Amino acid sequence: MEEELKSFVKVWGSAIISVSYCYYIPSKIKSGVHRLLSVLPVCVLFLVLPLFFVFTIFSSTTAFCLSILANFKLILFAFDKGPLLPLPANLFRFICFTCLPIKIQKNPNSQNHLPKWVFFCKAAIFGVLLNVHNYKSSLPPILLICLYPLHLYLVLDVLLTIVNALLTIILGCDLEPHFNEPYLATSLQDFWGRRWNLMVPAIFRPGVYHPMRSVCQPQMRSDWARFMGCWTTFFVSGLIHELVYFYINRETPTWEVTWFFVLQGVCTAMEKAVKRKTRWSLSPMLSRLITVGFLVVTGYFLFFRQIERSNMLERRATEASLIIDFVKHKLSNFLL
């Protein structure tokens, strides 16, 4: 455990030093290829850092924050785009907005904040799910299909909401929420674009969708250019998730996750095309059932099977227990 914490300090210390370099040096270079070349060594380093961990909690968190989000932010920053512009007022803010999955909320008064009791209900359900996983072997398959996506959503929503609340106090500014009640999505476009893990579409739109659409626009009809932009965005997302799975399991990719996102990209693009050409629509309740049902079923067979085979959730629970016991032991020694 101590070795893992030493690795944590070294990895994130290296990340802070690297981002500090980006704040003082590349930010002074003219945007474009030259600035991109100046940040590329940092991007390569961020791809390597998750490999220093054994615990999946640390490797997956570092991969998400540094290898994916921070790298995309820095590449967009090289071309004067993305969430790092305008340049934060000081180094501390630049480090936070680069290394952490946060973004300043542009219109804080326009957001419909849910009552606090909703968050506490989610936290309570998450606590129940942790105990339910102990009896996973005796649960019927139909229940497992719903259990995995619910667990993923709640663990991300609860933890990221807590992180957002703390950083809002520390930074003194309102931050964008990560989720917008995805279980209320009435379409795939609504789910992926406006409700699920909102930091990712905020980066993928300027980083993947718009460039791909611009490249395709002169070569094909606008409908097909939009389709290629949408499909490419989901394809890149699939490759990124395969990379995260590699950091966690250190195994050859199965490409199941990539196929999941390819399927989502094709279906989302087709859904958008149908909406533009017809006025046919379903009731909101039926739309929600179809959308969430499609995501849950396809997610179980293409996204969560790899998690199930690798016992990822059980490993993370064991690691969390080890970390808590280690902290308790150190605190008791310190106090005594």
Swiss-Prot record:
Its EC number is 2.3.1.75. GO terms for molecular function: long-chain-alcohol O-fatty-acyltransferase activity. Keywords: Acyltransferase, Lipid biosynthesis, Lipid metabolism, Membrane, Transferase, Transmembrane, Transmembrane helix. It catalyses: a long chain fatty alcohol + a fatty acyl-CoA = a wax ester + CoA. GO terms for cellular component: membrane. Catalyzes the final step in the synthesis of long-chain linear esters (waxes). This is Probable long-chain-alcohol O-fatty-acyltransferase 8.
